[in-house]
Amino acid sequence: MSHVFISHVEEDQSLARRIAEYLEAQGYRAWYYERDSVPGVSYLIQTGEAIRRAVAVLLIVSPDAIGSY
């Protein structure tokens, strides 16, 4: 099933959760790593597949995200 992929840094995890909850309340499906990843499977494999299947990618660009680069 297609979804909105939410990209964020670890510090914005709670914001990603709130955005996912909002999107899902509006009838969309959301995917973010902390909730939807499968333990034991590579981060790169999981996120790559989730992005490939996404109908949209939402980037959370916060001060923490900018500071991480």
What residue ranges belong to the model's regions?
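Conserved N-terminal substructure of TIR/SEFIR domains
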Residues: M1-I60
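Conserved TIR/SEFIR loop-to-helix hotspot centered on a Trp-containing motif
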Residues: D36, P63-Y69
